[in-house]
Each structure stands twice: as C-alpha cells, then as structure tokens.
C-alpha cells in the first residue's frame, strides 16, 4: 500500500508541477526566515521564494504517535505524511476544491502530528471510528479524511459526523485529483 501511495503522490506532484509551471512558472510563497524548508529552491526575492515539493531522505516515524494513541496508523497515512515536505497543494476532486495537507518542514510535521492526535481524540470522545484528515475544503467543518481502518477516503462533516466515501483508497483518490493553478 505504501508504495502505491508514494507512486500516486509522485505522479500527482509531477502533474501539478507540469501544469502549474506551464501556466505561471514556479510556485511562490511567503518567505519566513524562521520557517525554512527543504522545498525552497532559491534565495528569497521581495519576501517570496520559489518552491517545489521535496522528497525526504528518510521517512518520518509515527510510532510514538501511534503508541500514545494505542492505535495502529493506516500505512497510507504514514506514506502520505512521512515522505514529502510541501506547501498545501490546491486541487480538485470531482469538482470539489481542496488543498492536500503536507508538512513544510520538521517543525510543521510535529504540528501536524499534534493536530492529528487532537482530531483522533475528538473522534474517540464522540465515539466515531478513527480517521485522519488529509485535505481541507472551503468549509472549515468539512474535511477530506482517510478512514484509519479501511483506508477509504471520505468527505467528512465534523459537525454532524456524516461521511461520504470519495474513493476506495488513497492511491485511487490521488490519481483522480485535478490540478489547479498555484
């Protein structure tokens, strides 16, 4: 499963880069001296820096997080969050605009872990099955999530607990994403 996720993610990044760079060149983001990333390509100019998703040399370890939660994290989530650094990637899935969530640097990965822990604890308190958010939508109460048990990708309404299956797996979801301008 992890290899399939990594392959689908890499293909998505390549499509996103090709389409975006053909339209506007390299993506730019605000440069922050105390929030550097291996994604940065050049020196900053006028407070902005060009960037691209950057593959980590060594996968991030989620064992401590899983042990603290007494939960086995789905390998697809570990593959998604543990192998690349990136800004959020704007895209769409069957017309639904969203941003794939990925960590920008090691400190951001730690914040992501903390937010995932909070999300999982909230779901546990509400007696819902565990899911891991993987993308945001325009509605802050609606997330794209990975079902931690089955690996299905859901559209999840946090306020009601409603869940709609978008794809049978994370690789299938990633393969159907459409790129948006960056």
Swiss-Prot record:
Keywords assigned: Cell inner membrane, Cell membrane, Membrane
GO CC, one annotated term: cytoplasmic side of plasma membrane
Membrane topology, record value: Peripheral membrane protein
Main subcellular location of this protein, as a coarse class: membrane
Compartment list: Cell inner membrane
Coiled coil: none
NCBIfam families found in the cross-reference section: PRK04968.1 (NF003439)
Role played: Interacts with the SecY protein in vivo. May bind preferentially to an uncomplexed state of SecY, thus functioning either as a chelating agent for excess SecY in the cell or as a regulatory factor that negatively controls the translocase function.
HAMAP family: Syd (MF_01104)
Family of the protein in this entry: Belongs to the Syd family.
Name used for this protein in its record: Protein Syd
Source organism per UniProt: Aeromonas salmonicida (strain A449)
């Amino acid at each position: 499963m992890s290899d399939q996720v990594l392959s689908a993610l890499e293909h998505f990044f390549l499509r996103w880069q090709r389409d975006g760079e053909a339209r506007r060149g390299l993506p730019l983001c605000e440069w922050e001296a105390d929030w550097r990333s291996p994604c940065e390509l050049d020196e900053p100019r006028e407070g902005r820096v060009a960037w691209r998703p950057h593959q980590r040399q060594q996968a991030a370890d989620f064992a401590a997080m899983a042990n603290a939660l007494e939960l086995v994290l789905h390998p697809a989530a570990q593959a998604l969050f543990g192998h690349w650094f990136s800004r959020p990637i704007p895209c769409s899935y069957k017309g639904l605009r969203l941003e794939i969530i990925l960590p920008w640097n090691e400190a951001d990965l730690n914040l992501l872990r903390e937010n995932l822990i909070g999300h999982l604890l909230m779901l546990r308190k509400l007696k819902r099955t565990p899911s891991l958010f993987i993308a945001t939508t325009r509605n802050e109460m609606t997330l794209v999530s990975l079902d931690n048990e089955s690996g299905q990708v859901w559209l999840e309404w946090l306020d009601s607990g409603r869940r709609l299956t978008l794809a049978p797996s994370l690789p299938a979801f990633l393969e159907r994403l459409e790129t948006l301008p960056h």
